[in-house]
Amino acid sequence: MSGKCDVVVVGGGISGMAAAKLLHDFGLNVVVLEARDRVGGRTYTIRNQKVKYLDLGGSYVGPTQNCILRLAKELGLETYKVNEVERLIHHVKGKSYPFRGPFPPVWNPIAYLDHNNLWRTMDDMGREIPSDAPWKAPLAEEWDHMTMKELLDKICWTESAKQLATLFVNLCVTAETHEVSALWFLWYVKQCGGTTRIISTTNGGQERKFVGGSGQVSERIMDLLGDQVKLERPVTHIDQTGENVLVETLNHEVYEAKYVISAIPPTLGMKIHFNPPLPMMRNQLITRVPLGSVIKCIVYYKEPFWRKKDYCGTMIIEGEEAPIAYTLDDTKPDGNYAAIMGFILAHKARKLARLTKDERMKKLCELYAKVLGSQEALQPVHYEEKNWCEEQYSGGCYTTYFPPGIMTQYGRVLRQPVGRIYFAGTETATHWSGYMEGAVEAGERAAREILHAMGKIPEDEIWQSEPESVDVPAQPITTTFLERHLPSVPGLLRLIGLTAIFSATALGVLAHKRGLLVRV
């Protein structure tokens, strides 16, 4: 027996570490078992002379993400704003169009109506989905049986709206529109605060980063917990048949605990042997929920040359031939270590993984030169990347997605305890699931479930609302009267049709009254 404790936490990502910290603060004896040789999970900060520090995994925080902001502040971390001072670029059909604001402007009036209706409809549908129980939405079954591709084919009349919406899905959940359930995706966007909040840098999910990197959140909790965090300990068995739970690792250490928190992506539960076996619904759930595909790429330059052209570094790039769909400036706040971060998303991650690292860098630089209209993009000084698809202890990134039909059938067991095993991980969150924020919410909620089971807190304290961050306040997302009331393209056509019928009828009546109609 390697050790007795109150709680074993499986997984040393942000969710597991947040759970362990809360339990530790309550005076409980906690052991964290982490499969890798580092903590952080899907956050991963590297340090070297070329980059100083760099987040190769989850990195961004913003207003309304109050749990992660509070925890990070408690750990002594500070944030800085991602650069969005200059103009953004929308690159479509080989041309670059500078703009400001969260969404690229649309000049064609019919296309404008279509784009406006697209974002409005997604937000309206999201409002019907309960954040904590998407399967309870009035039209849950209908929406869950539909892919996002099918929904976009229904909503969008113009190719430009459909293309941008497809990029939006790829970017938000690193999956293709035909792979994900419409119900799940609409829930995902809703619980992040809607289409504008999730996509925005300023006043949105990508507003800030941590000085020194997001990996420090888990690292600093590890410093607090000391040797209670065990690295290179993949869990292979969890046995609940005795008085206490026995947790065995790959190197045959056995830990005995009163309770267990599983803080790993749901599908990685398949790497663990359970005794007694998992209940039917949990057993099937974990075989049905994959993670997205993404390669995070960072190209370094001598200086942030794009700023000289009044570009902030954000590029939204459409087209199958473009390896990267979305970029952000990744220069350090003092202006040093100039860099552009870009995502290779979904099927492109699978396709471009066949190339060498140098070949990928070359493709990125050529793309940036074209989009930014600058040969300086062809002279990188350094390049880093991380292919999350090859991580056996993540399974992909950013998060788990739900294919059609899964949320309504299996969603309700996501957070359901199995005996003395409780479930954390960003996937189980109800606000900013898929983000570091969701990881903290879920970890702390699972910890409080155990505290309640131990009689240390009342049931009504398991779920807690988080006060707004003083340092990173949220501005409300507003829409104009026109945006709320403009017709969709079909609505406009119906209006034109009705107007034509009404006009023809009125003319007929007038002609009849004046005796202009000749009877044959």
Curated annotation (Swiss-Prot):
<protein>
    <recommendedName>
        <fullName>Amine oxidase [flavin-containing] B</fullName>
        <ecNumber>1.4.3.21</ecNumber>
        <ecNumber>1.4.3.4</ecNumber>
    </recommendedName>
</protein>
<keyword id="KW-0285">Flavoprotein</keyword>
<keyword id="KW-0496">Mitochondrion</keyword>
<dbReference type="InterPro" id="IPR001613">
    <property type="entry name" value="Flavin_amine_oxidase"/>
</dbReference>
<keyword id="KW-0274">FAD</keyword>
<keyword id="KW-1133">Transmembrane helix</keyword>
<keyword id="KW-0007">Acetylation</keyword>
<feature type="transmembrane region" description="Helical; Anchor for type IV membrane protein">
    <location>
        <begin position="490"/>
        <end position="516"/>
    </location>
</feature>
<comment type="similarity">
    <text>Belongs to the flavin monoamine oxidase family.</text>
</comment>
<dbReference type="Pfam" id="PF01593">
    <property type="entry name" value="Amino_oxidase"/>
</dbReference>
<feature type="site" description="Important for catalytic activity">
    <location>
        <position position="156"/>
    </location>
</feature>
<comment type="function">
    <text>Catalyzes the oxidative deamination of primary and some secondary amines such as neurotransmitters, and exogenous amines including the tertiary amine, neurotoxin 1-methyl-4-phenyl-1,2,3,6-tetrahydropyridine (MPTP), with concomitant reduction of oxygen to hydrogen peroxide and participates in the metabolism of neuroactive and vasoactive amines in the central nervous system and peripheral tissues. Preferentially degrades benzylamine and phenylethylamine.</text>
</comment>
<feature type="modified residue" description="S-8alpha-FAD cysteine">
    <location>
        <position position="397"/>
    </location>
</feature>
<dbReference type="InterPro" id="IPR036188">
    <property type="entry name" value="FAD/NAD-bd_sf"/>
</dbReference>
<dbReference type="GO" id="GO:0008131">
    <property type="term" value="F:primary methylamine oxidase activity"/>
</dbReference>
<feature type="site" description="Important for catalytic activity">
    <location>
        <position position="365"/>
    </location>
</feature>
<feature type="modified residue" description="N6-acetyllysine">
    <location>
        <position position="52"/>
    </location>
</feature>
<feature type="topological domain" description="Cytoplasmic">
    <location>
        <begin position="2"/>
        <end position="489"/>
    </location>
</feature>
<comment type="subunit">
    <text>Monomer, homo- or heterodimer (containing two subunits of similar size). Each subunit contains a covalently bound flavin. Enzymatically active as monomer.</text>
</comment>
<keyword id="KW-0472">Membrane</keyword>
<keyword id="KW-0560">Oxidoreductase</keyword>
<keyword id="KW-1000">Mitochondrion outer membrane</keyword>
<dbReference type="InterPro" id="IPR002937">
    <property type="entry name" value="Amino_oxidase"/>
</dbReference>
<dbReference type="GO" id="GO:0005739">
    <property type="term" value="C:mitochondrion"/>
</dbReference>
<keyword id="KW-0812">Transmembrane</keyword>
<feature type="topological domain" description="Mitochondrial intermembrane">
    <location>
        <begin position="517"/>
        <end position="520"/>
    </location>
</feature>
<feature type="modified residue" description="N-acetylserine">
    <location>
        <position position="2"/>
    </location>
</feature>
<dbReference type="GO" id="GO:0005741">
    <property type="term" value="C:mitochondrial outer membrane"/>
</dbReference>
<dbReference type="InterPro" id="IPR050703">
    <property type="entry name" value="Flavin_MAO"/>
</dbReference>
<feature type="site" description="Important for catalytic activity">
    <location>
        <position position="382"/>
    </location>
</feature>
<dbReference type="GO" id="GO:0097621">
    <property type="term" value="F:monoamine oxidase activity"/>
</dbReference>
